[in-house]
Amino acid sequence: MSSSKLMDFGLTWIIMMMILLQGCRSCIESERQGLLEIKAYIISVITDPHLDIRRGWMSSDRSCCHWRRIKCDITSKRVIGISLSLESIRPPDPLPQLNLTFFYPFEELQSLNLSSGYFKGWFDERKGGKGLGSLRNLETLDLGVNFYDTSVLPYLNEAVSLKTLILHDNLFKGGFPVQELINLTSLEVLDLKFNKFSGQLPTQELTNLRNLRALDLSNNKFSGSLQKQGICRLEQLQELRLSRNRFEGEIPLCFSRFSKLRVLDLSSNHLSGKIPYFISDFKSMEYLSLLDNDFEGLFSLGLITELTELKVFKLSSRSGMLQIVETNVSGGLQSQLSSIMLSHCNLGKIPGFLWYQQELRVIDLSNNILSGVFPTWLLENNTELQALLLQNNSFKTLTLPRTMRRLQILDLSVNNFNNQLPKDVGLILASLRHLNLSNNEFLGNMPSSMARMENIEFMDLSYNNFSGKLPRNLFTGCYSLSWLKLSHNRFSGPIIRKSSDETSLITLIMDNNMFTGKIPRTLLNLRMLSVIDLSNNLLTGTIPRWLGNFFLEVLRISNNRLQGAIPPSLFNIPYLWLLDLSGNFLSGSLPLRSSSDYGYILDLHNNNLTGSIPDTLWYGLRLLDLRNNKLSGNIPLFRSTPSISVVLLRENNLTGKIPVELCGLSNVRMLDFAHNRLNESIPSCVTNLSFGSGGHSNADSDWYPASLLSNFMEIYTEVYYESLIVSDRFSLDYSVDFNVQVEFAVKQRYDLYMRGTLNQMFGLDLSSNELSGNIPEELGDLKRVRSLNLSRNSLSGSIPGSFSNLRSIESLDLSFNKLHGTIPSQLTLLQSLVVFNVSYNNLSGVIPQGKQFNTFGEKSYLGNFLLCGSPTKRSCGGTTISSGKEYEDDDESGLLDIVVLWWSLGTTYVTVMMGFLVFLCFDSPWRRAWFCLVDTFIDRVKDVLGVI
């Protein structure tokens, strides 16, 4: 070939390549216009300024194939992939609907990603519900993390070319949508996790999905026995995920048909019985999780020895009756595992096959009965180990290898370790991100090397015997630390000796130690703090105003020695939901205004606060505890806190009447106004409160903000097996448990209520006030109240017969009042009644007998001299005892008013003594004879004493 021809060929080749490359950058004009219309629509319904599509897809750019989120065919220049995932934005309000007509120009579209778009539905202006059928090449459709419900399912049934359908994290509910997906016979991957599907799986209809290779139904509400459901007809399955549902019964024998199964996740159900032998036939199995079920009997690890592809094995049982044995495992497994979890398996020793495992990344042997010295060899054999969980066992002495550069998670909590930490622990575990040593008996100081753990994010040393000062550079060296809990130790000295604004600390929990000094200003450097708990220490000084500069969610400084006024800035922290300053020596008044509407719990009891209670507290307030202060004035109307549930105002100086406006608080479950000076009558409208007939259903719900009860920490590990749906992830969920306690007098003692028990408690305490008038009949409508205390007032009239409707009542105290009449016999119907006290009233008649009333002693009826029958010693003698009706028209005069009786006795005594003194003042023979008699008596006494 001549050089000229060769040059011509080269130029032709270059020109063709340039044309081809240019074609890759351009696209069909109709599709470019379609993309611009999609952009305009999204911007119109989602106004988030951070939406990245605003900065791309420019109308001036004609080469749409290189736009972000767009993929084109390299030869035809047609758009084959569109991704509109908007996961980084805030959800719009209101939620928009998506117009499907925008996608019809893309006739060659193969993949459409609409995940995290915050859409609630679809509409189709041109083709009704059949529009997706025009996208004949569409194989992958991702609708995950939206607000879709079953209204979009009919649209999906037209997309007959689909091979992958992802619907996770939506609002779908009802049964498995087999009819809506009946035409999708080519479907290979179906992801329905994190929805609200329920009921049993269909039996016959699933055969229409016979090509399914991966099915994920986890985190729904499917139920029933797997033996009666049609899932076994899907014999082509390679992945089956059914975790976190309500399936029950044994693993069905038909599962043995899944010869191609690589992933099987049945965790967190109610499966029971023995684990079947046929799991040894799953020769392709890579991932097998049977965690958190009710399995029992013996399980031989020999069943997994032949699974040569196995990488992940997880097993635990809630029944406590599962026992692992090592038969036919003498030479170890034929596979090298990446993750092994054997929790709640009654293991008394570490399985021997682990000696032969050298590629483990995750080891979980928690919640067993393992004991002895810490198994250092697990770390030495598996140099790539990332997570070791041995919590809830009985290990003792802790020893560590020289180095563990890969270990990220170490949980040794709830064991019996009783030695000091190695001085170089921070250097050995230099890569550690998560350390939990809580609930042991570790001694001594925190080693200074722990201040050099640059990667540590979570550290829990609570409930040990650590002492001494914290390392000086703890908060500067551990600059990745976001969660620190040191509760219930004997640490002393200042809280923070040195800090840096580079520290990312979010949660600081240091309660129940011996820290001293003032609240340090070095806290200001920890600008990301959202949780501070310094309660039960020895802190002094005042509460600094600058604490109000943090974006705190929780602030607890209770039970210290703090003085001075409460800074008003604390009441204006935007997202503060718990403020606990109780048990100090704080003084001054409460701030009149608060700009935060997020506060849930305000606990200021056991201080020296004065002034009135403002009616402008947090709008979202649920719990208000101001007990044992010196507050005065009237009870506030709580107009600005309509959701309040618990109001504790006992032992203050409150006066006036109980406001009728309280009856509008439909969520109240506890009212404690005892030991004040409230007067007038009890309003009859209290029946509108939530523990009465007018209560709302949400009184039963947990009134804590659910999103604030826990701190969820996820640590993603490497992918250990191949998955068609999602890779495995290792996560830890540690509660930030603040144990908010409510103290309420029940059954003649103070009980503590928190969380679950708090939601079940309903009580009203108006004792030790100056209330008068009759007890309202309407109080009998408080059908859910468990404790009612009206003692030590001046209430009159009779005991309402309507009290027989208090079917949940456990404690009823009406003592020290002016009640008269008989005890209603209907009260014997109160089967939950444990404490009943009507002592020191003017009651009369026969004491009712039967059921709970047979358990009450005489103390329940003292001071009622006209009551007769058991348990008093007064017999009714067959005579008709006055019922006291003749006194009902005159509440001020009982037959034997105790007060009048004592006044009469006192007057008589004073009169006699005064008469005797007057008698002695006159000089008369009688007076002289009296003194002679007294002198003679004194002489006789002296003589007797002298003889003795």
Swiss-Prot record:
The record gives the membrane topology as: Single-pass type I membrane protein
The UniProt keyword set, sorted, is: Cell membrane, Glycoprotein, Leucine-rich repeat, Membrane, Receptor, Repeat, Signal, Transmembrane, Transmembrane helix
Glycan-bearing residues: 99, 113, 183, 328, 381, 392, 436, 465, 608, 653, 679, 688, 789, 837, 842
- The reply to whether DNA repair figures as a keyword in the UniProt entry is no
**Stretches of the chain found on the membrane's Extracellular side:** 27-897
Pfam families for the chain: LRR_1 (PF00560), LRR_2 (PF07723), LRR_8 (PF13855), LRRNT_2 (PF08263)
The yes or no answer to whether the keyword rRNA-binding is present is no
Cytoplasmic face of the membrane: 919-948
Q: Which residues form the signal peptide?
A: 1-26
Q: Where are the LRR repeats?
A: 106-129, 135-162, 163-183, 184-208, 210-233, 234-257, 258-284, 286-306, 307-332, 334-357, 358-381, 382-404, 405-429, 430-453, 454-477, 479-502, 503-526, 527-549, 550-573, 575-595, 596-618, 619-640, 642-665, 666-689, 758-782, 783-805, 807-831, 833-855
- Location relative to the cell: Cell membrane
Give TM segment ranges: 898-918
Sorted alphabetically, the Gene Ontology cellular component annotations on this record are:
plasma membrane
Note the Gene3D superfamilies from the entry: Ribonuclease Inhibitor
State the family it belongs to: Belongs to the RLP family.
What's the protein name?
A: Receptor-like protein 45
